[in-house]
Amino acid sequence: MHPYDCESLNNRCILSFLYEPLFVVSSENFEASPVLASSYEVSDDGLTTTVHLRPEACFSDGSPLTAQDAAYSLISSRGTVYYGSRLRHVTSIAASDEKTLVLTTDTAYECLPLLLDIPIIKDGSRDEAVPLGSGPYVMDGDTRLVRNTNWWQTAAPIVDFAEVKLTLVEKTSEVRDNFEYENVNLVLTDPNSAAFAGFHNDYELWDARLPIMQYIGYNITSKVFSNYGLRSAITYAIDRDHLATDIMGGFAQPAVLPASPQAPFYDGKLANTYGYNLTKFSQQLESASVEDMDNDGTLDLYVPSLGYAVSVAGTMIVCSSSYQRVEAATEVVNALNALGFKITLKTLELSEFRQALQTGNFDLYYGEIRLSNNFDLTPFFSASGSMCYGGLDDSVMLNLCTQALANNGNSYNLYKRLCERGYITPVLFKNLAVYTTRGSIAHPTDYIDWFLIPPADETAEG
């Protein structure tokens, strides 16, 4: 259960009792607040972020928590199973004194703390099964957490018990049974996962918002979807409210822009401009000279490089490992075909899906990605980016991504061009479900926020 390698949602619940980050990122507004840090400042050029640690912070053994511990932790998290390349723009991490951490980046960053919700461990403890942390509890064997008598914070933890019992399970059905018999009081789960097991006892249900985006991607080298006028029309054809409510069971937020609607730079007015609107869909197709030229019921597009018109047809691929994404992709395909497209949906196993993306063997795809907390889109538009499929590398978009990192007010220009050109079509952002036995815990996301925001997962299938 290492904080950098653990992928189990429920096991990561436990980590919030054992460890603390420099900053916490709220799932309510995607803004960073200090925890182990007391403050930070950014240099005028945006390339250096200096973080000041709380002088009273210490580990559970009573030893001081230093900037060297923080530097070691951030460096150790790079390339791990859970944190991957989250800090890809960070070129240097070093302690300048006992309580001052200095980070340098290869591009200007307005708010690097959005990426610093990584648990801090003791210097030199990376290879330990359960490294020393600074949280309000410590492990006592495999099935019990006890209060950390050296906890540096003066306020009581939100979950204020002398001990927390842990239950070992192997299957989701065992999670369900233990929750229904009240052996377990809290369960964190993805209600749209194939492994989800529903509950039937009396419970309270909370949702936790995430930067996990589902979207439509395109092969812009194809003869049909190379036309950005056609691609940009598709945003108007997607009923995102229907997908979020009926396909996702309400555990999602419809999103026209590639950021959570809760993010401070999500522009609702801009989103409304490109939202579901069949009148605008028809107008955009008309402006792109897309029409049913031979009256066969399928739209046609004149391709200048060919010298003749082709049907607006193609294949959308989706990873078969998620029944929810298959269902959502099916809805998208049906909606487009009802409007004159001729799209075939093809489900592929994970390895086949990845290979098809990498080789460009698709026209469209329905993907899912865990974006970083600042919703950086660089991996889509950099030639070396891990999400750059179907010829998506674009120097103008890459420059706009860089400008958005330097000042999130620049996100407007990035998102406007993305919608106008139809590089990708955002659909929704997923939520997780937090189940608690009634009356046992109040506002559970308050104390588990720091790990509920996943790192960037650079695979389109999530």
Please give the residue ranges for each predicted region.
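N-terminal lobe/hinge region of extracytoplasmic solute-binding protein
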Residues: M1-D44, I75, D449
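Aromatic- and charge-enriched surface segment that lines or borders ligand/interaction sites
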Residues: S38-V81, V224-S226
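Gly/Pro-rich hinge or "lid" segments in bacterial periplasmic/extracellular proteins
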Residues: L9, S26-S27, T104, A108-K165, ...
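Append "and occasionally in soluble cytosolic enzymes with long acidic Gly/Pro-rich linkers
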Residues: V146, N227-V333
